[in-house]
């Protein structure tokens, strides 16, 4: 093995190789293949609270059956909840369509998985890591970055980048036949019209039929909630209250949760009953090619709505503007696998210190169907929203008088005069036509 190469293109025979093991066809076949070819596979499974996983404890047992030297289940749920709350606090969501956001649930899961699994491998003196990400996607770069951040001595071996593996087991049928030929009664599951990846924060549905934009959200079977577009699915309006303390969600419907994992699970149940947080997005992958995904994130959506309501009621306009600008930038860094880079930590610390710390209060909403909701009440000891300041009724001790406003408007004459002068300059240079038919038809041609 060339010690100068971080990415290994051939199986490191006789050496320990860690594999992120899901128990599915791909990783099962890869683990057995590596074992038979002479490597020493170690299996690591992340418990991320995936809504479509029934029995986590069975996965390491399955890995041992396929030939793993050792198999470990790593509980990542508490850390995932922590990072999910941090993303809410920072508004770290840069992909949206029509005001409906993608909550970066897969990038958050990769940040946790990539660091915690490699850390567990270090404990076992395993310094070679493989996972199931393909060369066309985002995850190959995310895992690469997080893995090397956690263990600078790490080497990467991916069977899906090994030509020998591809030649021998290049497809699902070949992998299934390989397992059967080696004495494993593997029954290949019915292939869906799309691929699904999930964790406690959300689910991603993509690829196959969803690569075509004429295949809509209706072909997806939600795993975290209901198909809100189906008129046969009865959805009753439901009131829900969300309480924050210093930027952290702590209670739902008056019930406090000491465990953030349980808090997220309950938020998912509430939002999922309505299909809240589902979206259809076209996004730019890290390599600048566009992809399309259908996303679920009922709990994240519920917390985001309540959090932003409190943000707008507590903070001033400039703070809100900076929160949004920084959130867009931080969302991109998170998406790119840079959640723990210094530039991301700087943006996170800013939002968590100067925005989130003031967010204490409770928001009550009515959830209906899909992303249809109403805000019914907003309460906080930190609200700067004071209706008496702008009341249309006569009030005593008014915050300002008509004379105060006259003075304020008079001061505006300074920049209005400057603006008219600039428009005149633009007109004289031919950049802007004034008068009839122009974009500013009423200004005339005189300065």
From Swiss-Prot:
It comes from Neisseria meningitidis serogroup A / serotype 4A (strain DSM 15465 / Z2491). This is Argininosuccinate synthase. It catalyses: L-citrulline + L-aspartate + ATP = 2-(N(omega)-L-arginino)succinate + AMP + diphosphate + H(+). One of its GO terms (biological process) is argininosuccinate metabolic process. Coiled coil: none annotated. It is found in: Cytoplasm. The gene is argG. PROSITE patterns: ARGININOSUCCIN_SYN_1, ARGININOSUCCIN_SYN_2. Pfam families: Arginosuc_syn_C, Arginosuc_synth. ATP binds at residues 20-28, 46, 132, 134, 139, 197. Pathway: Amino-acid biosynthesis; L-arginine biosynthesis; L-arginine from L-ornithine and carbamoyl phosphate: step 2/3. Its main location: cytoplasm. The keyword S-adenosyl-L-methionine does not apply. GO terms for molecular function: argininosuccinate synthase activity; ATP binding; protein homodimerization activity.
């Amino acid at each position: 093995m060339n010690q100068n190469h971080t990415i290994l293109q051939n199986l490191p025979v006789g050496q320990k190789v860690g594999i992120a093991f899901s128990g599915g066809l791909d990783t099962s076949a890869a683990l057995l293949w590596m074992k038979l070819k002479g490597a020493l596979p170690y299996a690591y499974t992340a418990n991320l609270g995936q809504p479509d996983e029934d029995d986590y404890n069975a996965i390491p047992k399955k890995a041992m059956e396929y030939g793993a030297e050792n198999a470990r289940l790593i509980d990542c749920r508490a850390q995932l909840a922590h990072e999910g709350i941090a993303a809410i606090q920072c508004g770290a969501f840069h992909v949206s369509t029509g005001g409906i956001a993608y909550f970066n649930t897969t990038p958050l899961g990769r940040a946790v998985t990539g660091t915690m699994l490699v850390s567990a491998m270090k404990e076992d003196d395993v310094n070679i890591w493989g996972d199931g990400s393909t060369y066309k996607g985002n995850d190959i770069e995310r895992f690469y970055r997080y893995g090397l951040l956690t263990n600078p001595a790490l080497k990467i071996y991916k069977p899906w980048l090994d030509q020998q593996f591809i030649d021998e087991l290049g497809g699902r049928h070949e992998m299934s036949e390989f397992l059967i030929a080696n004495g494993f009664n593997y029954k290949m599951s019915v292939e869906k019209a799309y691929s699904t990846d999930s964790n406690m924060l959300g689910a991603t549905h993509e690829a196959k039929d969803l690569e075509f934009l004429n295949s809509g959200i209706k072909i997806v079977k939600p795993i975290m909630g209901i198909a809100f577009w189906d008129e046969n699915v009865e959805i009753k309006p439901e009131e829900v209250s969300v309480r924050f303390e210093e930027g952290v969600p702590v209670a739902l419907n008056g019930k406090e949760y000491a465990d953030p994992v349980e808090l997220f699970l309950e938020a998912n149940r509430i939002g999922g009953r309505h299909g809240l947080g589902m979206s259809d997005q076209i996004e730019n992958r890290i390599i600048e090619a566009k992809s399309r995904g259908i996303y679920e994130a009922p709990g994240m959506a519920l917390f985001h709505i309540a959090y932003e309501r409190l943000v707008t009621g507590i903070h001033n306009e400039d703070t809100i503007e900076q929160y949004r600008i920084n959130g867009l930038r931080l969302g991109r860094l998170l998406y790119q696998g840079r959640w723990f880079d210094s530039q991301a930590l700087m943006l996170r610390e800013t939002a968590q210190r100067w925005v989130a710390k003031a967010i204490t209060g409770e928001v009550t909403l009515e959830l209906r169907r899909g992303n249809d909701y109403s805000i019914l009440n907003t309460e906080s000891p930190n609200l700067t929203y004071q209706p008496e300041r702008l009341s249309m009724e006569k009030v005593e001790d008014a915050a300002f008088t008509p004379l105060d406003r006259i003075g304020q408007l008079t001061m505006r004459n300074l920049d209005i005069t400057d603006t008219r002068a600039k428009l005149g300059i633009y007109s004289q240079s031919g950049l802007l036509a004034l008068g009839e038919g122009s974009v500013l038809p009423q200004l005339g041609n005189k300065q």
